[in-house]
Design a protein with these regions (language model features):
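Acidic, Ala/Val/Gly-enriched low-complexity intrinsically disordered segments
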Residues: 2-7, 13
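Hydrophobic alpha-helical segments
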Residues: 10-149
Length: 149
């Protein structure tokens, strides 16, 4: 498939060298299977992405991570789903997490993000990066009006 070819190409290029092997049959562990089943049910899809496969080496870590992701990203809240994904993508850009940038940009698109919205998002990320660097270099003092007391 396209995903396998892309992953294989990236692995050959050496850009995605995991520090752990991908578990071969993670669902043989009942705790992992329960999490994977909940991911499938929550997303309405049979696709389990690499993040979850790799975290399956430690069922407790997998359970804890999915619990938090589900509570924040997959539960209705005051933020709409596209906004949540774009916030996650912006933080992922700041943290240089290539996997997260790709997965959350894809999730934002799947949840209805338009190309116009993506272009605006990238403009904001670019502007924030540039002005953050400028202000850090200049060491501009914070206005007292911005302090929360």
């Amino acid at each position: 498939t396209v995903v396998q070819v892309t992953v294989s190409k990236r692995l050959k290029e050496g850009s995605y060298m995991s520090t752990l092997p991908r578990p071969l049959n993670p669902e043989s562990d009942p705790r992992v299977k329960a999490v994977f089943d909940d991911i499938r049910a929550s997303r309405g899809s049979d696709f389990i992405n690499n993040l979850w496969h790799y975290l399956a080496f430690d069922p407790k870590l997998l359970e804890d991570t999915w619990r938090d992701v589900k509570a924040i990203m997959a539960t209705p809240s005051s933020l709409d789903p596209v906004t949540k994904e774009l916030i996650y993508a912006a933080v992922s850009i700041a943290n240089s997490c290539d996997y997260c940038i790709h997965s959350h940009t894809a999730a934002a698109r799947a949840k209805g993000m338009t190309e116009e919205q993506y272009a605006e998002f990238l403009s904001i990320v670019s502007l924030a990066g540039r002005t953050n660097h400028l202000l850090n270099a200049i060491k501009v003092p914070v206005d007292p009006e911005f302090d929360h007391t």
